[in-house]
Amino acid sequence: MNRLAHYLRMCYRLTLNADKQEETLWKEMKKFHLRQDYPSGIYEKEKTISATLKLTEYKSETFSYSLVFGQYYCNVRLIRSYPEELSPEIFILTTHLNNILIEGGVSVDTEEQCVEYTIRKDILVTLLYPGFIYERINRHYKVAKRLHQAFTRLINENEAPALIVADILKSLEKEEK
């Protein structure tokens, strides 16, 4: 019976127009975040939820979850400011990381000298499958922690981007086993 209900819910959601799909997903996002036990703010007008989560033991950052132009976005600023002289290495590391990311992308803002990680998915895909909201948020959070660690190693320890990426790939191999 549960499968039938899920199938009927999917069929119904497929018939909704884009505005109704966005409205339905927004309600589910709010419900999900209200059930969680972390500080968050819900901004109705912007259809954005901001949650403060720990990237490291000593550093928390604001993660944003938004609905914009038919897309579901997960975004976090990994590095708020980096030394200008490290710009070439920041770009090299960003390029390497974008090549190994399964979804989402790392971007660098040269004016603000910050680094962000964003996942963007179609609203309909996120709406159709139960658990996708949690899965997206969880995956975004786990990857953001790893990316933040990579950029921190570059900035604080002045480690070469190639070595940082090699260590990430090695740890991913271990996790797969």
Language model features: what each stretch is:
Residues R77-T118:
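Short, internal acidic amphipathic alpha-helical interface segments
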Residues M1-T62:
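Charge-rich, low-complexity N-terminal segments
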Residues K47-I49, Y72-C74, Q113-V115:
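Hydrophobic residues embedded in beta-strands of well-ordered beta-sheets
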Residues P39-G41, S64-S66, G105-S107:
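Short, surface-exposed charged micro-motifs
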